[in-house]
Amino acid sequence: MAELTVEVRGSNGAFYKGFIKDVHEDSLTVVFENNWQPERQVPFNEVRLPPPPDIKKEISEGDEVEVYSRANDQEPCGWWLAKVRMMKGEFYVIEYAACDATYNEIVTFERLRPVNQNKTVKKNTFFKCTVDVPEDLREACANENAHKDFKKAVGACRIFYHPETTQLMILSASEATVKRVNILSDMHLRSIRTKLMLMSRNEEATKHLECTKQLAAAFHEEFVVREDLMGLAIGTHGSNIQQARKVPGVTAIELDEDTGTFRIYGESADAVKKARGFLEFVEDFIQVPRNLVGKVIGKNGKVIQEIVDKSGVVRVRIEGDNENKLPREDGMVPFVFVGTKESIGNVQVLLEYHIAYLKEVEQLRMERLQIDEQLRQIGSRSYSGRGRGRRGPNYTSGYGTNSELSNPSETESERKDELSDWSLAGEDDRDSRHQRDSRRRPGGRGRSVSGGRGRGGPRGGKSSISSVLKDPDSNPYSLLDNTESDQTADTDASESHHSTNRRRRSRRRRTDEDAVLMDGMTESDTASVNENGLVTVADYISRAESQSRQRNLPRETLAKNKKEMAKDVIEEHGPSEKAINGPTSASGDDISKLQRTPGEEKINTLKEENTQEAAVLNGVS
C-alpha cells in the first residue's frame, strides 16, 4: 500500500499521511495511518501525492520548508509549512507560517524537507478497473498475496477483492495498467484456479501424511466385503459409512472399491470393532430339518418374518432342491440369511431355539400317539372279550382283587340289602322299576335281543342249562366259554330269571384276562372236583350253598322279605321264563326229565328246601 500513499490536508493546514482504498468520481476513500481518524472519503482538492523519495534535501537560511511536527500530543505528526531563520550545525531554527504569532522551534535536519511541489489530485490522476471473479475463486482472491505477480505484471498500484460486488479491484496511476488488466485477467484467474487445486491437494496430502503417521501406532482393522453386498455395506448415500465415522474414537475409514476392502482406524480396539459392525455384511446359512420347514416359516410367513425383524437381518432366502450352491445334509433345507455379523448371530440363536422347541413338541406328540395307540390296543381286547359290550367311563374289573374273591360275604350282604329294599318298596315303586328293567333287559349288556347270554349273539337252546341236562356227557368247557351263566345253576325258569335280574344290579365284573374255567374254583377256598377232574354245575351249586350256610348274618330277619320278593319277581317275569331259559317244547321237557342224573335230583331237592337262598346266592359271579 506504500505506492498508494497520499497526503491529506487537515483543518489546521498540515498534511497527514494516508492510503487510498478506493477511487470515486470526485473523491477518494482514504485510510489514515495508525487509524488516528476513521476511514472517510476525501475530495480530490484536499489530497496530494507525496514527494519522490529520492529528492535532494538542500536547505539554507530563509528557505521555505516543511517540518514534520504536531500541534499537540493527541494528534499524529504531519507536514507543517515553515521558514528557516537560522542554521547552526545540524540544528535549524524555524518559524511556523501557519501560526498568527511568531512561533520558533529548534529542529534537526531529519525533520525537514523541501516544500512538496505536487498539486492536488484530479479525476484522471488514478485509474480503476474491475474483474469479475467466479464463485469457486472468490475465497482465493480475497488473499492479496495471490495477486502479487499479477500486480507487478500490469503495473497496478493496488489490487484487492471487493466482497460486496464480488469483483477484483485494480487501482493504478497509469492508463496502461487498464489495458494490461484486460489482457491478463483471464490468465490470472486460470492460474489462481490451478494454484488453488494444487494447494488443496498438497494440503490433503499433508493431512494424510500426518494421519498416517498417527495411525501407524493406532488401532486398525481391515476386512473385505463381497461385491454383491457392497451396496448394503455403504448404505443409502453412504449412510452406513457416515454412521461408522460418527463412532467415538474412530479417526478414519478408507474404502478400496476395486477390491471391496475396508480399513478402519481408531483410537481404541472397541471403537474400531464397533465401526466394523456397521460395515461388515456377510451371507450365511442355517440347516433346518425338512419336516420343520413349514413350521419355521409359519402361516403366511409370520414366524420367519418375526425372526427376521428381531434379529435385524436384511433378507432371507430358502434354497430350492434344484440348487446346489451350498452343501446339503440329508433331510435338511438351507435357510440363507444376509446381514451384519451381529444380526447373523442373532438369527442363528433365534432359529436354533425355535427348531429345538419344535423338535421337543414333536417328540411330545409322538409320545402321546404311542400312548394313545397302547390305549387303543388295550381297549380293543377289553371291548371284544366275552360279548360284554362297551363299558362306561366308571367301568372297573368285574373280578376285582384276590381279597374280593376270597371274601364273598361282602357282596352277599349287599345283595340282601337290595332284596330288603325291594320287599319294603311299594307296589308303585316296584312297577316303575320293573318298567325300567324291562326296557333295559331285552338287549342286556352285550347280549342279543332274544335274551341269549353268549358272546356274539344268540345260540338257541345250546346256551341254557337245559342243554347241559339233556347231554350230561357233553364237554362242560363249551358252556363256560360261550355263556355267562356258567357262574349260576339255573335249574328252572323262575329261579334263573330272578337271579339274572339281581346279577344285573350288583355283580362283580370279570376281566378278559381271567381264565373262564377257573371262575368256579375262585368262588371258594375248597373247590370240589369229581372223579373225572372237572367241575360240574352241581358242584358249583353245592359250593354256593355251603358258602351261604357259613355266613354269620341272621337270616330270620330277611326271610319274610325274601319270600315276598321272590314271589313277586317270579310272577312279574313268568311269561318270559321260557324264552330266557331255553327250550319251550314239551318234548324238550320230557327229554330233560328222562335224562336226569342222581346229581340233578340232588339239585332239585336242594332248590326246594332253600328257594329263598338260592335266589340270592346262585347269582354270584
Curated annotation (Swiss-Prot):
Phosphotyrosine modifications at: Y68
Effect listed in the UniProt record for changing S420D: Mimics phosphorylation state; leading to increased activity
UniProt-annotated stretches for the region RNA-binding RGG-box: 442-457
Keyword Acetylation annotated: yes
Region of interest: CC1 domain: 201-208
GO molecular function: molecular condensate scaffold activity; mRNA 3'-UTR AU-rich region binding; mRNA 3'-UTR binding; protein heterodimerization activity; protein homodimerization activity; ribonucleoprotein complex binding; RNA binding; RNA strand annealing activity
Induction: By Interleukin-19 (IL19).
Compositional bias (Acidic residues): 483-493
Tissue localization of expression: Expressed in all tissues examined including heart, brain, kidney and testis. In brain, present at high level in neurons and especially in the Purkinje cells at the interface between the granular layer and the molecular layer (at protein level).
Extent of Polar residues compositional bias: 394-410
PTM-bearing positions, type Asymmetric dimethylarginine: R447, R453, R455
Biased composition (Gly residues): 445-460
Stretches assigned to coiled coil: none
Main location: cytoplasm
Cross-link (Glycyl lysine isopeptide (Lys-Gly) (interchain with G-Cter in SUMO2)) at residue(s): K56
Disease linked to the protein: Congenital myopathy 9A: An autosomal recessive muscular disorder characterized by severe hypotonia apparent at birth, poor feeding, ulnar deviation of the hands, laterally deviated feet, fractures of the long bones, respiratory insufficiency due to muscle weakness, and death in infancy. Congenital myopathy 9B, proximal, with minicore lesions: An autosomal recessive, slowly progressive muscular disorder characterized by primarily proximal muscle weakness, neonatal hypotonia leading to delayed motor development, mildly delayed walking in childhood, and difficulty running or climbing. Cardiac function is unaffected, but most patients have obstructive sleep apnea. Muscle biopsy shows type 1 fiber predominance with disorganized Z-lines and minicores that disrupt the myofibrillar striation pattern.
Protein purpose: mRNA-binding protein that acts as a regulator of mRNAs translation and/or stability, and which is required for various processes, such as neurogenesis, muscle development and spermatogenesis. Specifically binds to AU-rich elements (AREs) in the 3'-UTR of target mRNAs. Promotes formation of some phase-separated membraneless compartment by undergoing liquid-liquid phase separation upon binding to AREs-containing mRNAs, leading to assemble mRNAs into cytoplasmic ribonucleoprotein granules that concentrate mRNAs with associated regulatory factors.
Name recorded for this polypeptide: RNA-binding protein FXR1
Organism: Homo sapiens (Human)
Gene: FXR1
